[in-house]
């Protein structure tokens, strides 16, 4: 499995059966009809990872409102995951409602390109956003030293779902873009005729936007 090509944006998420804190799960079929975020962390019982899991848990309902589930992963054992989840619930008073993949041999992590040069064994902080058709839509990598921005992951899902629904493209820092606020950008014109119809629109024919 580790010798196969790492999935890219726009490709089908690879089929795999994994052991998790919620039992065996077959991906991506387990989340058929839903989006899911698969995120890796370097290790259980580590401070930065604990802050991330706390934040994911606190915002879990926001993900669910977007028809999106969460699933974690590290190269720790399932027993380690279970002990860590129980520690978080007892000491931080928050339930971890999503499964965590146990990947002690690193096969899943290698298949998904989560083992980077700074460590030959531990996973970096990778994020795969997969849509309701099992297609990889976004990939992020954070170094071990920096915790993820969970709001940015939520923003990315909202943006991707809006792109699918409305056929628009999304500006920087949306929905608080410095030029156009919460508006979205029209895709480039496909013909000269379409371009001429946009000549008098701000900012120019190649840069038009609208309310959504």
UniProtKB/Swiss-Prot annotation:
Among Pfam families, the record links this protein to: 1-cysPrx_C, AhpC-TSA
Supply the InterPro entries for this chain. Answer: AhpC/TSA, Peroxiredoxin, Peroxiredoxin_AhpC-typ, Peroxiredoxin_C, Peroxiredoxin_TDXH, PRX_1cys, Thioredoxin-like_sf, Thioredoxin_domain
Keyword Iron (UniProt): no
Q: Which UniProt keywords are present, listed alphabetically? A: Antioxidant, Cytoplasm, Oxidoreductase, Peroxidase, Redox-active center
Q: What class of enzyme is it?
A: oxidoreductase
GO BP terms in the entry: cell redox homeostasis; cellular response to stress; hydrogen peroxide catabolic process; response to oxidative stress
Catalytic activity reads: a hydroperoxide + [thioredoxin]-dithiol = an alcohol + [thioredoxin]-disulfide + H2O
Coiled-coil residue windows: none
Q: Which residues form the Thioredoxin domain?
A: 7-162
- What does the entry list as the binding residues for substrate? 125
Localization: Cytoplasm
Can you cite an annotated GO cellular component? cytosol
Q: What is its EC number?
A: 1.11.1.24
SUPFAM superfamilies registered for this protein in UniProt: Thioredoxin-like
Keyword Oxidoreductase on this protein? yes
Indicate where this protein is primarily found.
cytoplasm
- A molecular-function term among this protein's GO annotations: thioredoxin peroxidase activity
Annotated catalytic residues: 49 (cysteine sulfenic acid (-soh) intermediate)
Kindly state the subunit structure of this protein.
Homodecamer. Pentamer of dimers that assemble into a ring structure.
Q: What else is known?
A: The active site is a conserved redox-active cysteine residue, the peroxidatic cysteine (C(P)), which makes the nucleophilic attack on the peroxide substrate. The peroxide oxidizes the C(P)-SH to cysteine sulfenic acid (C(P)-SOH), which then reacts with another cysteine residue, the resolving cysteine (C(R)), to form a disulfide bridge. The disulfide is subsequently reduced by an appropriate electron donor to complete the catalytic cycle. In this 1-Cys peroxiredoxin, no C(R) is present and C(P) instead forms a disulfide with a cysteine from another protein or with a small thiol molecule.
Give a short account of what the protein does: Thiol-specific peroxidase that catalyzes the reduction of hydrogen peroxide and organic hydroperoxides to water and alcohols, respectively. Plays a role in cell protection against oxidative stress by detoxifying peroxides.
Record-linked NCBIfam families = PRK13189.1, PRK13191.1
Question: Of which family is this protein a member?
Answer: Belongs to the peroxiredoxin family. Prx6 subfamily.
User: What name has this protein been given in UniProt?
Assistant: Peroxiredoxin 2
């Amino acid at each position: 499995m580790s010798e196969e090509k790492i999935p890219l944006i726009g490709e089908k998420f690879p089929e795999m059966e994994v052991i998790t804190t919620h039992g065996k799960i077959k991906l991506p079929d387990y989340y058929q009809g839903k989006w899911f975020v698969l995120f890796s962390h370097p290790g259980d019982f580590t401070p930065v990872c604990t802050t991330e899991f706390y934040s994911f848990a606190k915002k879990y309902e926001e993900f669910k409102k977007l028809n999106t589930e969460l699933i974690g992963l590290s190269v720790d054992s399932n027993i380690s995951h279970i002990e860590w989840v129980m520690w978080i619930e007892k000491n931080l008073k928050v339930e971890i409602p999503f499964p965590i993949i146990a990947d002690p041999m690193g096969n899943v992590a290698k298949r998904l390109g989560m083992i980077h040069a700074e460590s030959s064994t531990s996973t970096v902080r990778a994020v795969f956003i997969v849509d309701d058709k099992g297609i990889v839509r976004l990939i992020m990598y954070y170094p071990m030293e920096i915790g993820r921005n969970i709001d940015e992951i939520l923003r990315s899902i909202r943006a991707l779902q809006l792109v699918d629904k409305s056929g628009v493209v999304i500006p920087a820092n949306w929905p608080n873009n410095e030029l156009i606020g919460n508006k979205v950008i029209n895709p480039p014109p496909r013909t000269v005729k379409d371009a001429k119809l946009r000549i008098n629109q701000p900012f120019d024919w190649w840069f038009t936007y609208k309310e959504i």
